[in-house]
Amino acid sequence: MVEAAAGRRSGANRRRPSGGGERRRQQQQHQRLVAVAVAARVVMVAPAATPAPAAGGGGGCVEDILGCLLGVLRALGVTWAAAARPQRQQPRLAAQTPRGPAPGADGRRAAAELRGIPGRIAGNGACAVASLYTLQGKKGVNQDAMIVWENFCSREDTIFCGVFDGHGPNGHLVAKRVRDLLPIKLGADLGTDEGRQTSTSSIKSNGDETGSPGNMGRDAEQNGEYPEIFTALRTSFLRAFNVMDRDLKLHKSIDCFFSGTTAVAVLKQGRNLIIGNLGDSRAILGTRDKDNQLMAVQLTVDLKPNIPSEAQRIRQRRGRIFALPEEPEVARVWLPKYNSPGLAMARAFGDFCLKDYGLISMPEVSYHRITEKDEFVVLATDGVWDVLSNTEVVSIVNRATSRASAARLLVESAHRAWRARFPTSKIDDCAVVCLFLDTDELSETSSSMARDMTNAVEVSSGQHSNTIQLSTGVSSDVVTAVLTDGDDLSAVDAVAKLVTLTDLPNNASGATQSITTK
């Protein structure tokens, strides 16, 4: 029986075109062996599963076995025909069971790895030098995200922090992805010599055109040029933001055509502050004046369409700018021929429907040298700035009973201000990061805490420490689309020449800002 079945199988194979006599004979022999093995297994199982045939009935069991065997052979025939390629190294039977991860498993694994990185906080919480807090508004899902990452790039004197305000149908997903990947891409670029050296000469030559207002301009006047560390880190910021936007464009499961996010990212390295800004989130500095009174200094500019240089770029690329009748104070960006999407900012991650019409993802990067009078930096989304002035924010943070409670106190104050000033409006999402600029004594204490926590994590991997190894703390699956040697900033620099900040208002005085909503 088995030989006859195997013979029919080999005869069927002979009618099919195949290449090579020797290879053909080997395939036929292999097919016979598999057929014999399958038939033997069926015969072993059949008596237990099939009742014995009646006397003289003539083989009900045998018919079942033959039918089963022929079905198996037909299946094997289809498999061999489809798999008779040079790369096939094992029978198809061994590959019928899927072995890959379940859908979404890679994303969950990557998220778990990020949560397990010591020194990284991406939810409500606090550490020795910072506190962060977010609260959902009344507009639906919370689209704000935030992060504090101590000992960034395995440097004890480096901290990365940022806030991200998503918008659009998938804004919450975009904000979280930027929160998770932007610091990784920045750290990957900082770890290369290319990231520290590329285009520093062009940055110096274009500094007057692309520099941001505030302390960076004053430092440039005093020193004659920007600090060397700024020229190097500015390049890394530009490259990281560029790659982050490219990652969003190529993402398979997050539709960013009508969704995006703002970003304010601060890198503190020793006494140096590097600030990268996209959109209308904001960073301010709490510092002391000559009379030792606490004052607010705005470190970023709200990049909105009503800024002359931003409006000029958008209109040059056929984008339209106008405000809705019910919100005459809020300028919005629209497509050339459609009254959509009405974006209330001039720069953002995502929003690829507008990327051909003036919206860009190139950040404004500024620099500040920390002095002994500087006390803290506050990063917040526009849910805070729409109802609180810079001076009010600095005052609220200053009166917090502890560093750990400062961010929460500010968010709760913003929610109370929303209810008082706009009782009929929906409260916007709020996210705040308060970064405290330690004195030398506090820095020494923080370093001691870091050493203690590092020793603790060696005993228990479940505890957090302030030391990370970026090269080993995150798997290669998480770090996607990192810049290669062939990438450059030619396109970014070309845009930078069109975008000047000579027309931007210098809001570094800490004055109350006009209240607008998205």
Curated annotation (Swiss-Prot):
One GO molecular-function entry: protein serine/threonine phosphatase activity
Keywords assigned by UniProt, alphabetized: Hydrolase, Magnesium, Manganese, Metal-binding, Protein phosphatase
Cofactor note: Binds 2 magnesium or manganese ions per subunit.
Composition skew (Polar residues), residue ranges: 197-213
UniProt keyword DNA repair, yes or no: no
Residue spans of biased composition, Low complexity class: 1-10, 86-105
Organism this protein belongs to: Oryza sativa subsp. japonica (Rice)
Catalytic activity as recorded in UniProt: O-phospho-L-seryl-[protein] + H2O = L-seryl-[protein] + phosphate; O-phospho-L-threonyl-[protein] + H2O = L-threonyl-[protein] + phosphate
Binding-site residues for Mn(2+) 2, renumbered to this chain: D165, D382, D428
Boundaries of every PPM-type phosphatase domain copy: 129-437
Transmembrane region(s): none
Family stated for the protein in its record: Belongs to the PP2C family.
Protein name as it appears in the record: Probable protein phosphatase 2C 14
Keyword match NADP: no
Cofactor(s) essential for the protein: Mg(2+); Mn(2+)
Pfam families cross-referenced by the UniProt entry: PP2C
EC number(s) given by UniProt: 3.1.3.16
Listed GO biological process terms: regulation of intracellular signal transduction
